[in-house]
């Protein structure tokens, strides 16, 4: 699938949309190299196939720029990838030194960086702080349609890491979506068996980055499915 780190059902929706719009999706393919040609670029895949075009967009993520900061001399431990290692209150291995943001490699989101920074500030000032809890942090992929997710995932349920039920509602069954002619997307809710407390969810829809807020609040406040449905 595209977006291998996201919910597989969400990735499938995007693949279907991409192909319907005329895009060719090469599944289970990895790029080995890219070279400039006389009139464009040629990408060679791991299986030997080649793809040619006018341009190649390199969407390979980012790497931390920590190599020349003298962190080793200060006693700040980094990982093999160069990320600064921190605990859940943003402390590094050096006493009195904190780190926050993408350089830590902890869920590379602006909102998480802000949380880490606030936690580091208050902890440095001696205040009692709650450690960073990524299970209540929502993340978004700004594709069309968008993907919003929070908490435990379908993969967690399938692997038995959490005893939960998963309910998926197609967006096409929603009255507003019908009126707007929107057929691609869904809302997936993950809740614990027995207590029915919401512990995760996925939204694939236009403006999913805004719609996920309701599920994120339910996860953070440990609301049950019935409590959410009654609002």
Where in the sequence are the language-model features?
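Rossmann-like dinucleotide-binding cores of NAD(P)H-dependent redox enzymes
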Residues: 1-38, 42, 107-114, 122-156
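Glycine/Thr-rich phosphate-binding loops of Rossmann-like dinucleotide-binding domains
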Residues: 3, 65-68, 80, 107, ...
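Conserved beta-strand segments of alpha/beta enzyme cores
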Residues: 24-25, 50, 77, 163-165
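Short loop/edge segments at beta-strand edges and connector loops
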Residues: 27-29, 80, 168
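Conserved beta-strand-loop-beta-strand element in the redox core of flavoprotein oxidoreductases
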Residues: 35-50, 56
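FAD-site-proximal beta/loop scaffold in flavoenzymes
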Residues: 50-126
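Flexible, glycine-rich terminal cap/loop adjacent to redox cofactors
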Residues: 125-126, 137, 142-231
